[in-house]
Amino acid sequence: MINSEFSIEEHVKYAERLQDERGLTKEDADEEAFRVQLNEVAVINRAIDVGINVSEEEAFQKSQETREDLENEEAENVKEVLIGIQEEIEQLGISEDDYWNEYMLSSYAHAVMREKLMEYEQNENPMKNWNELQQEIIEEFTVSQSQQINEFKREIGMR
């Protein structure tokens, strides 16, 4: 359920979405998709390193809370988000329940893990805000995993 490694498939999907939805060039979309995935992988690995776990039940609960918020129109840009979700469900060829109960569980597991890490780091380092802490996590990961990062960049066609 938790993926702590780089994914070429996820990179390609996100980069294509950035090109389609935001009109980015392929190069800019690749840069942004890489940056987002680096952030995610660094944070997830840090959470794992400090012993943070997320159960399937926690991920499911987060998924259901988000679904309820959207259905009750308690989130911003509700209509746009719901249209995007409906389009994705149709493209995937799955039911709405399968989307929320299975397909999105990994994303919500990552979200819960990020929330738990944020709480952990702020308790450990109360003088720093989350953005500073997150930047340090990414920098440490970039140094310690430079070989893996460079290999992934080669695989996705980045320098």
Swiss-Prot record:
Instruction: Tell me the keywords, alphabetical order.
Output: Plasmid
Q: What is this protein called?
A: Glutamate-rich protein GrpA
The opening ranks of the lineage are: Bacteria, Bacillati, Bacillota, Bacilli, Bacillales
